[in-house]
Amino acid sequence: MTEKIGLFTGTFDPLTNGHLDIIKRASQHFDQLYVGIFKNDQKNPLFPTDKRVEMLEEALTNLSVNHKVKVIKHERDLTVNIAKKLGVTAMVRSLRNSQDLEYEKNMFYFNLEMTGIETLFFLAKPELEPLNSTRIRELHAFGQDVSAWVPENVSRELRKLDEQKK
């Protein structure tokens, strides 16, 4: 029987409770789930890539499925090329709303055409739908407490950023 290998990618800047929920739920469908932190040249990151890897790995230690999850980073390649190299059997994507669906439908088409790799979509839980990293960064920039929406270790790192600015 072929090993089921998933790949869930994003910038995770910062990691949210919504991301962790998708990782936990998706990992139950795979023998191995790679979580890829990829550099996006169109975004100005709050945290460097290595710090985001470190924060995600720390947050995963509290999940019961962490033995199935491996964090990877990549700075310069198409996600589908990484997926092929890893032997991925399905991409994992999260849908919060209709805007996500429109974007992901387009990506699904190209991923499938280029590699034959299917995409599994996970709907965000209703209470996590509003969460996204951009909103967390905005709220944090205006001095708002975002600890309810991010893992504790991420909240701690955000506070450290605040201290460095003083």
From Swiss-Prot:
Its EC number is 2.7.7.3. The record marks H19 as: Transition state stabilizer. InterPro entries: Cyt_trans-like, PPAT, Rossmann-like_a/b/a_fold. One of its GO terms (molecular function) is pantetheine-phosphate adenylyltransferase activity. Substrate binds at T11, K43, T79, R93. It is an enzyme of class 2 (transferase). The keyword Acyltransferase does not apply. Gene3D superfamilies: HUPs. It holds the Pfam family CTP_transf_like. GO terms for cellular component: cytoplasm. Disulfide bonds: none annotated. It catalyses: (R)-4'-phosphopantetheine + ATP + H(+) = 3'-dephospho-CoA + diphosphate. Its cofactor is Mg(2+). One of its GO terms (biological process) is coenzyme A biosynthetic process. ATP binds at T11, F12, H19, E104, L128, E129, P130, L131, N132, S133, T134. It is found in: Cytoplasm. Reversibly transfers an adenylyl group from ATP to 4'-phosphopantetheine, yielding dephospho-CoA (dPCoA) and pyrophosphate. Belongs to the bacterial CoaD family. Homohexamer. This is Phosphopantetheine adenylyltransferase. It comes from Lactococcus lactis subsp. cremoris (strain MG1363).
